[in-house]
């Protein structure tokens, strides 16, 4: 497997609409204010988080069960700044819609700006021929409330091209998160 460059990413966007909307270069300023950067980088793409969040709460005294997830574990918010309570968790989604080629696996890593504040971003790999908005998982590991800024950079996607095309893609096996829109909760 090889990690793919900015040139390859740009061509995949032009020829296959791999990322929409697409920022051709790093955006660091918006409306004369510094922001957490997003857009194309040397060997990856920094994606933005939308203003749609689901924040974990204990107001309903439920339990988190991945096989029987209770939507009442969360409160929905559409905000420019999401406040994650201390030692808590929130879900968001990318502004960008991704369409992954059959010979590519995508890995997500967090932005250092958030990591240095104790905010960890987790995303499972984007598999060959998966498409949709990416649901982002934010963990606030600090004993203090933490801010996530909507429409600014949240994570970086790295594109790994396989030496061979896979026999069975995410689309072939009709994966349960195929073509997800918005923040998607656990499915079994």
UniProtKB/Swiss-Prot annotation:
The keyword Hydrolase applies. DCTP binds at residues 111-116, 135-137, 156, 170, 179-180. Its EC number is 3.5.4.13. InterPro entries: dCTP_deaminase (IPR011962), dUTPase-like_sf (IPR036157), dUTPase_trimeric (IPR033704). The active site is at residue 137. GO terms for biological process: dUMP biosynthetic process; dUTP biosynthetic process. GO terms for molecular function: dCTP deaminase activity; nucleotide binding. Keywords: Hydrolase, Nucleotide metabolism, Nucleotide-binding. Pathway: Pyrimidine metabolism; dUMP biosynthesis; dUMP from dCTP (dUTP route): step 1/2. It catalyses: dCTP + H2O + H(+) = dUTP + NH4(+). Gene3D superfamilies: 2.70.40.10. CDD domains: trimeric_dUTPase. Homotrimer. Belongs to the dCTP deaminase family. NCBIfam families: dCTP_deam. Catalyzes the deamination of dCTP to dUTP. This is dCTP deaminase. It comes from Rickettsia bellii (strain OSU 85-389). The lineage of its organism: Bacteria, Pseudomonadati, Pseudomonadota, Alphaproteobacteria, Rickettsiales.
């Amino acid at each position: 497997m090889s990690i793919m460059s900015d040139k390859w990413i740009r061509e995949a966007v032009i020829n296959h609409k791999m990322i929409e909307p697409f920022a051709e270069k790093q955006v660091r300023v918006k409306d004369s204010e510094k922001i957490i950067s997003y857009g194309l980088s040397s060997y990856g793409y920094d994606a933005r988080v939308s203003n749609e969040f689901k924040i974990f709460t204990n107001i309903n005294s439920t339990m988190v069960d991945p096989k029987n997830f209770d939507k009442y574990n969360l409160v929905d918010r559409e905000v420019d700044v999401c406040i994650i309570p201390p030692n808590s968790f929130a879900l968001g989604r990318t502004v960008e819609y991704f369409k992954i080629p059959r010979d590519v696996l995508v890995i997500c890593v967090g932005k250092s700006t958030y990591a240095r504040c104790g905010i960890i971003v987790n995303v499972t790999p984007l598999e060959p021929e998966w498409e949709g908005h990416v649901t982002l998982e934010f963990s606030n590991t600090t004993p203090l409330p933490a801010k996530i800024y909507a429409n600014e950079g949240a994570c970086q996607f790295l594109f790994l091209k396989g030496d061979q095309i896979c026999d069975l893609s995410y689309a072939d096996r009709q994966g349960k998160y195929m073509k997800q829109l918005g923040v998607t909760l656990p499915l079994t």
